[in-house]
């Protein structure tokens, strides 16, 4: 085998290894995380919102435990409205800008604007709501009824 062929084969193998390491997490969640960081200026890591209360994170049920959890329920409801409009909020990528005065949603189609608005409203709500460490990683079976 020629050295050039070996280099091409090596490049293909490295590319495939890199592609297999890419998460299948919906890319919209990355944008939502960036919006949160833009609004709170990095004061709280996004992962703190991933397992908070009854609604922040995957799923949601019961009565929200506090104002921050209500932000998450409102965000879930907003995504539900997006789905009713035929959008796929977890997969919809949108344009936004992070400016000194705060983030703004950019131009796009109806679904992109709607989903960006859901995420922006939630990020702003997170920023103004107190964070209670006692509501992080709670026992949802007991507290979310």
From Swiss-Prot:
Catalytic reaction list: a 1,2-diacyl-sn-glycero-3-phosphocholine + H2O = a 1-acyl-sn-glycero-3-phosphocholine + a fatty acid + H(+)
Subcellular localization: Secreted
EC number: 3.1.1.4
Residues at the catalytic site: 75, 119
Keyword set, alphabetical order: Calcium, Disulfide bond, Hydrolase, Lipid degradation, Lipid metabolism, Metal-binding, Neurotoxin, Presynaptic neurotoxin, Secreted, Signal, Toxin
BP GO annotations: arachidonate secretion; lipid catabolic process; phospholipid metabolic process
Record's cofactor remark: Binds 1 Ca(2+) ion.
Purpose: Snake venom phospholipase A2 (PLA2) that inhibits neuromuscular transmission by blocking acetylcholine release from the nerve termini. PLA2 catalyzes the calcium-dependent hydrolysis of the 2-acyl groups in 3-sn-phosphoglycerides.
Family: Belongs to the phospholipase A2 family. Group I subfamily. D49 sub-subfamily.
Protein name: Basic phospholipase A2 PC17
Organism encoding this protein: Laticauda colubrina (Yellow-lipped sea krait)
Highest classification ranks of the organism: Eukaryota, Metazoa, Chordata, Craniata, Vertebrata
